[in-house]
């Protein structure tokens, strides 16, 4: 950490407190960790990931949050309104130390134009999902979810493995950068198009990507060689997906699977139109935002049309939750929704059991603390073969960014067991300092997003946004350390509402009680949400877990 007002930020390490308690300290360190140069995409602009997803509204607001957290008593709660600390209230020790609301707008005004106008006026910020809720852990944060998605794809279409299969995708930013490693962990070959060569180089540095090949034909030739030999391999190709995907289709090249994780959710701040360098795009964005959006959407239409073309030629094609289809339709491509989103295609059965992205970070900064938690997870869930494979591969292949952290998908009935075991390890000194447990907002009961997590719900409840609000209220009542409700993450303003919660594992008896309640109730609501929507798998899970649903089965 530095004392400068806009310079490098790094979370404190070790066991010495700079706040009045570990719940406040956990929030402070994770906020700072979000802006660690090893973690954030553009830390000097407070941008963590996802196009323009920020940790705080301004540097002035950031330092005011830091000051407020350091002065916060153990029976007080800090309120953060879209990245700005607005008040501290006396509450009680079990209350969250921080409550956050990011990017929320009244529905009639919930569009990018209005949001940007308010953002320019200094009244709001875009929090994405884990940027503004202070629990981003770098590309690993999405890695296991991406691994699970490609594993489900392999099971459904390719006999349980991606060996000998080529997957084409685009986008190697903070989220999309997980794709090459997730594909190779499933034994496949990844062709990854990225418009910003610096991102390719960063993924190479972090060992998420194996090779960079600038020539398209040479990249395809190398991918086909790896396919024939059954060699897991990932290749980064500099280029614009709106140009490269159609070019591959015109060549008659058909990969086995195609998806995309460019920043299509934001046609102004994220996606780069075809025909522009990064510098030219930045100039156009500033000079003529309206034209920029039109050109970006036209490019997305071509990009999406190529994906439909691959599908028609036999490729398995799916949307990876960035709203490319929605923006492509606005760009004039009427058949944009011809292929499904990844949640209805592969992930919903896991959501029915409350399974989702369970993550934790070592506040000590000591990688040995994460090694101890890895062993604990392996001991707790030896029967979960996919989880065991993930932990073993992650230990070997995943480089920590910022504070050491781990993610794995656990469900209702499992998360609290892991949390309680971690608490025992902190209490006994095996883990040297408290850890923070949190999750992505992409979870089974914490999001309403009709183009992603709640696409195609059985009862038609895709757009019902009560569930993420109930999730935040439930986690607040259960004793979470900090809780956040956001708007627009993943798919853009006007298209999602979602919530997140974190709990500090401090080795105390009170900590154990908080952990058990938060990590039982949070995923259980995901089971309830899907049971209420009519999924029999979720109803069976609710009965097995003893969840009390007054109208279950009626």
Curated annotation (Swiss-Prot):
One GO BP annotation of this record: L-histidine catabolic process to glutamate and formamide
A GO term for molecular function: urocanate hydratase activity
Main location, first listed in the record: cytoplasm
Positions contributing to NAD(+) binding: 50-51, 128, 174-176, 194, 199, 240-241, 261-265, 271-272, 320, 490
Keyword Cytoplasm listed: yes
Annotated catalysed reactions: 4-imidazolone-5-propanoate = trans-urocanate + H2O
CC cofactor: NAD(+)
Cofactor note: Binds 1 NAD(+) per subunit.
Pathway annotation: Amino-acid degradation; L-histidine degradation into L-glutamate; N-formimidoyl-L-glutamate from L-histidine: step 2/3
Keyword terms, alphabetized: Cytoplasm, Histidine metabolism, Lyase, NAD
Gene Ontology, cellular component aspect: cytoplasm
The EC number(s) this enzyme carries: 4.2.1.49
Family matches, as PROSITE patterns: UROCANASE
Record Pfam families: Urocanase, Urocanase_C, Urocanase_N
Family according to the record: Belongs to the urocanase family.
Function: Catalyzes the conversion of urocanate to 4-imidazolone-5-propionate.
This protein's name: Urocanate hydratase
């Amino acid at each position: 950490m530095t004392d400068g007002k806009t310079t490098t930020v790094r979370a404190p390490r070790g066991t010495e407190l700079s706040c009045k308690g570990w719940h406040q300290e956990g929030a402070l360190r994770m906020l700072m960790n979000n802006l660690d140069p090893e973690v954030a995409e553009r830390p000097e602009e407070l941008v963590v990931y996802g196009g323009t997803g920020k940790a705080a509204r301004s540097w002035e607001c950031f330092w005011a949050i830091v000051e407020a957290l350091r002065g916060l008593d153990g029976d007080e709660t800090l309120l953060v309104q879209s990245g700005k600390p607005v008040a501290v209230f006396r509450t009680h020790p079990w209350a969250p130390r921080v409550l956050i609301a990011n990017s929320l707008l009244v529905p009639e005004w919930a569009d990018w134009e209005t949001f940007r106008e308010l953002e320019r006026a200094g009244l709001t910020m875009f929090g994405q999902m884990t940027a503004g809720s202070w629990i981003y852990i770098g590309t690993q944060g999405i890695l296991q979810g991406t691994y699970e998605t490609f594993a489900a794809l392999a099971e459904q279409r390719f006999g349980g493995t991606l060996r000998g299969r080529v997957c084409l995708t685009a986008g190697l930013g903070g989220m999309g950068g997980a794709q090459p490693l997730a594909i190779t962990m499933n034994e496949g070959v990844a062709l990854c198009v990225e418009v910003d060569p610096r991102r390719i180089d960063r993924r190479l540095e972090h060992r998420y990507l194996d090779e960079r090949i600038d020539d398209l034909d040479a990249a395809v030739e190398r991918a086909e060689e790896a396919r024939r030999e059954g060699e897991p391999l990932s290749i980064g190709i500099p280029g614009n997906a709106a140009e490269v995907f159609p070019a591959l289709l015109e060549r008659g090249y058909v990969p086995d699977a195609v998806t995309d994780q460019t920043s299509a959710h934001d046609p102004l701040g994220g996606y780069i139109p075809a025909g522009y360098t990064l510098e030219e795009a930045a100039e156009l964005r500033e000079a003529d935002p309206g034209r920029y959006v039109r050109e970006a959407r036209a490019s997305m239409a071509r990009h999406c049309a190529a994906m439909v073309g691959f599908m028609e030629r036999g490729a398995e094609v799916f949307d990876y939750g960035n709203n490319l289809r929605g923006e492509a339709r606005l760009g004039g491509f009427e058949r944009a929704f011809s292929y499904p989103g990844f949640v209805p295609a592969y992930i919903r059965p896991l959501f029915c059991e409350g399974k989702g992205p369970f993550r934790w970070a070592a506040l000590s900064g000591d990688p040995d603390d994460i090694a101890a938690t890895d062993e604990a997870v392996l001991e707790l869930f030896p029967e979960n073969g996919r989880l065991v494979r993930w932990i073993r591969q992650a230990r070997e292949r995943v480089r920590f960014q910022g504070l050491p952290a781990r993610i794995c998908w656990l469900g209702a009935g499992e998360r609290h067991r892991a949390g309680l075991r971690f608490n025992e390890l902190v209490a006994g000194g095996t883990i040297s300092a408290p850890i923070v447990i949190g999750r992505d907002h992409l979870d089974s009961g914490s999001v309403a997003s009709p183009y992603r997590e709640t696409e195609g719900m059985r009862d038609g409840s895709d757009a019902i946004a009560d569930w993420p609000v109930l999730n935040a209220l439930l986690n607040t009542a259960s004793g979470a350390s900090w809780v956040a409700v956001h708007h627009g993450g993943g798919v853009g303003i006007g298209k999602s509402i979602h919530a997140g919660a974190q709990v500090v594992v401090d080795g105390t008896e009170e900590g154990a009680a908080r952990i058990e309640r938060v990590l039982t109730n949070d995923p259980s609501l995901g089971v309830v949400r899907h049971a209420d929507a009519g999924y029999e798998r979720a109803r069976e899970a609710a009965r097995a877990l003893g969840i009390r649903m007054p109208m279950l089965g009626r």
